[in-house]
Structures are given as structure tokens and as C-alpha cells.
Amino acid sequence: MFISVRIGRRETKHPVLPMDEGERQIIMEKKNLDWSNLGFAYVKTDKRYVANYKAEDGKWDAGALIDDDKIVMSEDAGVLQYSQSVFEGLKAYTTKDGHIVTFRPDLNGQRLYDSALRLEMPPLPVDQFVDSIHQVVKANAAWVPPFGTGATLYLRPYMFGISPVIGVKPADDYHYRVFATPVGPYFKGGAKPIYVRITDYDRAAPHGTGNIKAGLNYAMSLHAIVEAHKEGFAENIYLDAATRTKIEETGGANILLVDQDDHLVIPKSNSILPSITRRSLVYVAEHYLGMKVDERPVYLQEIKDGNFKEVGLCGTAAVISPIGKINDHGTDIELASGMEEIGPWMNKLRTTLLGIQEGELEAPEGWIHVIE
């Protein structure tokens, strides 16, 4: 097996060597949890990483691991007054041969960098981001679920304005933190098809913040998702705010479609968050499965007309969750793949990406970051 490791801006490809018994013993001393039945919820772990930005210094400090999971701040902190916060989500997991790894953390670092710029926050260098992830996972190795359980160690890096702000303006000082928590699948049914609805709410405005990972985007979706769950739907599909004719994404995942010609179709919009999972699945489709990929605007009417045989959601949390049925204001649109099992193309995409992540298939250069 070969794994590509990013070191700073370099990428190097080398064989993963078997661990000796001492190394394996360290990794196998796991916490006593029911790994196969974990929910998608917060569990406090041992260490978290913290770094601070002071305007007077003009740079981020070196950062460090700490034990304390509490944050003390002013009642007038920028994040509390004007929601000046951005975040990321990624996972650490155990490969088939016992190594602990993360998946493409440099891309999460770049996305956090871009998100920070959009909200007038000092961006954290990507190299420091990757190092912070490495430190947190290594310090919490006992919390990384064993291979084959379906669980992972979810990592939540986030940044926010911490200094007092009373007028509408950016904060001066900022706090960056990464915590880790073991989680089960985002959707409890795993790869079982889900039932979603078309919502009348908007997720993002044209030329707004839909293409960054800002907390405010998710706050706006909370009412819609609570309402959807009460009505028996797993998620909301948001349409473009300008014309309300094109599908964009859900509150927590990007959308993938397979048309009648077996092309993978990716909705195109400046309001869609650039998903790292989606980007990876596009590569898998083209280079592993030989699929043609079309990135273009996708109209809701196309789905109603039966132009797509499979539809699914993808993201760090969901990986791929197939959609079996879509409710459009009381009218059900049933996909050809149905509600019983994942469709063949979504299944191939999902199992191939999981095979790459878990070390069963050779990964493209730079995709796998080895912790230990």
C-alpha cells in the first residue's frame, strides 16, 4: 500500500510500512466505547488545539494543545454580536492496516483561509492548519474508532472574533480552536435512501456567503431543518434564491446526480459551498470509474421529468447518502433507484472513495495524511 503525505507545500509518495507491536499497542489502547452504535453528537475528548491572533502583533501565535474545553470571552465579543465565525469539518479514521489518517486536510485549510478572508478575518496559514489537525488527532488517538466500526473521529476547526465590538465592524482579535469527537454516521441509516423535500426557504443569496463555510449560513438553515424533521423529511433541498428554478444544495451537503446517459452531474452555482468530498468524488468518477462529469446548472424541472436515475447527497459528514424520493410541495418525485437501496452508481462512488480513504485502494498523490 502506498500513501501520499503532504509536508508543508510538498507532497511525497512512500510505502506505508507495517507497525511494530509497540506502535500497534499504543494505537489499540482505545477508549471503552460502543463504537458501532455512536450517534452524531459531541463527546468531550482529551486535548484540543488553540491559537490566538492579536491585532497588535499582526500574526497568529504558534498555538498549543490544551486540556480545557471552556472558552472565556467578553459579553461583547465579535462572534456574539455579529456572528463573525467560520469553521471546517473533517475526519480522522483507522485504515485497514491500522494506521490513523486524515483525508485531504490541506483543502480544508485552504477553504477556511478563503472563508476567513470573506468575513474580514485574518486567515490562518494552511500549514499551521494542517499541523493543528495532526496534533489534535495524535493527542486523541485513543478516541479514533477502530477500523470496520463505521465510526470516525470528527474534527471541528473553527475561528471567531473574540475582542469586544459594539459598532458593526470586524473584531481586532481572533481565536482559533480544533476539537475532536468520535461520531457515528451523520444519517443513521448509513447508505439507505432518504426522503427529502423542496423547501421555500433560501439558504444563500446571490453574491452572498453561500460559497464559504460560515456559521451564519447554518444558523439560517436551522428553522428549515427542524420543520423538515417534524414533517418526516431527512433534509431540505434549497433552490437558487434568484429564480427558484435550479437546485443548489441541502443544509449540510452538496448534491450529486446521475443522468440517463450515466454521466455524473454536478449543480453549478456561485452560492454552493465547494465540497471537498464532492471534488474528490468527481475525481473518482473520472479516473476510477470512467464516468463523464458535467458541471452545470440543474433545473428542478429536469428531476420532475425523470432525467436522472440517481440522486445523492455528499459531504464530510454524510459521505454519500442516496435520495430515494423528493417531495415538492406535496407531490412525491420517486427516483428510479427507489427507497430500498442505494443506486449502482452512487454505490460505486461511495465504496470507491471509502476504499481510498481506508487504504484498500491506492490513493491519488496528496490525498492521505498519515498521523501514525
Predicted regions and their residues:
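N-terminal amphipathic/basic-hydrophobic helices that include classical n-h-c signal peptides
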Residues: 1-25
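Short acidic-glycine loop/turn motifs at beta-strand connectors
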Residues: 50-60, 93-98, 105, 162, ...
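Active-site-adjacent loop/helix segments that line or gate small-molecule/cofactor pockets in enzymes
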Residues: 42-56, 78, 191-239, 345-372
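Active-site- and interface-proximal helix/loop "cap" or "latch" segments in soluble metabolic
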Residues: 87-89, 93-129, 273
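Conserved catalytic-core subdomain
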Residues: 20-46, 188, 242-372
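Conserved phosphate/anionic-ligand binding catalytic regions in large, soluble enzymes, centered on
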Residues: 74-90, 320
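Extended Lys/Arg-rich, glycine-bearing segments that form polyanion-binding/interaction patches
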Residues: 34-37, 108, 113, 119-231, ...
